[in-house]
């Protein structure tokens, strides 16, 4: 789960639960701000703020981030130092789409190593995630955390590098 840093402490119980259930917990920026409109110094301060919150809740930091709006070039230019996890399948759930529409649009997109983008801001997303996970299992896919996905192929996530997917050690990246 990529979580907005400033929301971690107010929702510490959810952060702890996600971690306890084996999910990866990582950064989705401190404020969900547009990195193109934030100073480089402020961007570089985000990892410490996010990691302080994570350490106070689950005892461990993160080393990666999903940049709001996908504007990772600003983060790389500022040399923030995280690995950036983007996505290869976008559900557009944030638009309020129904589960059936999301499934019909995404089913044909899935391939091994994909990273799926979903949000927690819409009431329908948990149900969509459940339906999607069940369908993916039926198709023979295995769901992995980001760490598991890259570790299975021996890929080390590098700072200031963007990752979109990983399959058999082949990553789609940008530096």
Question: Model features per residue range: what roles?
Answer:
Residues 8-9, 124-175:
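C-terminal domain-boundary segment and adjacent tail
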């Amino acid at each position: 789960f990529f979580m907005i840093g400033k929301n971690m402490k107010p929702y510490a119980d959810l952060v702890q639960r996600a971690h306890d259930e084996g999910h990866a917990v990582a950064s989705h920026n401190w404020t969900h701000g547009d990195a193109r409109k934030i100073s480089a110094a402020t961007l570089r301060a985000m990892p410490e703020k996010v990691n302080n919150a994570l350490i106070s809740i689950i005892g461990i930091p993160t080393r990666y981030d999903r940049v709001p709006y996908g504007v990772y070039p600003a983060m790389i230019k500022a040399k923030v130092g995280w690995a950036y996890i983007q996505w290869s399948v976008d559900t557009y759930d944030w638009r309020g789409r129904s589960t059936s529409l999301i499934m019909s649009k995404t089913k044909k997109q899935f391939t091994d190593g994909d990273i799926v983008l979903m949000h927690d801001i819409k009431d329908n997303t948990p149900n969509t995630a459940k339906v999607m996970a069940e369908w993916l299992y039926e198709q023979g896919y295995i769901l992995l955390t980001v760490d598991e996905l890259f570790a299975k192929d021996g890929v080390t996530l590098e700072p200031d590098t963007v990752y979109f997917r990983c399959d058999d050690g082949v990553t789609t990246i940008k530096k």
